[in-house]
């Protein structure tokens, strides 16, 4: 059953709102995926903060017109699932990780920072660590000297206690 005009306008408005805040859109073809697998993909997307939806391509074309993602319109053919995220790598990572384990989901294209990406570009974007992962690594690097210094002070204090007890 098709959507009536009001429903179509609502979908375009919803997608436009998501695209307005987005940094990345990743697109994949999803022919023949089992419902359970698609439900698992949606759950993973929700955890990662990715807006994931199967949409009519014409409605998405309207939603991305006059946005930095407008160049993606030529790639929107066939049955597609759209991942839209504010995190630069989250949408690409969710779809790419799922595609590795399910050959019925095929990455097709994406867009990041106004540039249209092909399948290889989306895979490259997905391989970049997320912001949270990079911050965790930075924090670990910054804490290493402090924890090493604290460990040295504790060892020195223990050594002095042992010398004081022996004397």
Curated annotation (Swiss-Prot):
Quaternary structure note: Part of the ribosomal stalk of the 50S ribosomal subunit. The N-terminus interacts with L11 and the large rRNA to form the base of the stalk. The C-terminus forms an elongated spine to which L12 dimers bind in a sequential fashion forming a multimeric L10(L12)X complex.
In this entry, which stretches build a coiled coil? none
Task: List, in alphabetical order, the GO biological process terms annotated in this UniProt record.
Answer: translation
The protein here is known as: Large ribosomal subunit protein uL10
Among Pfam families, the record links this protein to: Ribosomal_L10
NCBIfam families, from UniProt? PRK00099.1-1
Q: Which family does it belong to?
A: Belongs to the universal ribosomal protein uL10 family.
């Amino acid at each position: 059953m098709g959507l009536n005009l009001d429903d179509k306008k609502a979908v375009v408005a919803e997608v436009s709102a998501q695209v307005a805040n987005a940094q990345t859109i990743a697109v994949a073809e999803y022919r023949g995926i089992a419902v359970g697998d698609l439900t698992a993909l949606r759950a993973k997307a929700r955890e990662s903060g990715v807006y994931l939806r199967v949409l009519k391509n014409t409605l998405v074309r309207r939603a991305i017109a006059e946005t930095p993602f407008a160049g993606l319109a030529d790639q929107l053919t066939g049955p597609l699932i759209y991942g839209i995220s504010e995190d630069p790598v989250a949408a690409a990572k969710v779809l790419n990780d799922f595609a590795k384990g399910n050959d019925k989901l095929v990455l097709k294209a994406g867009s990041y920072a106004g540039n249209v990406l092909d399948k290889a570009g989306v895979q490259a974007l997905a391989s970049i660590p997320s912001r949270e992962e990079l911050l965790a690594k930075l924090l670990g690097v910054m804490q290493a000297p402090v924890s090493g210094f604290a460990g040295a002070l504790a060892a020195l204090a223990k050594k002095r206690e042992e010398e004081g007890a022996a004397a």
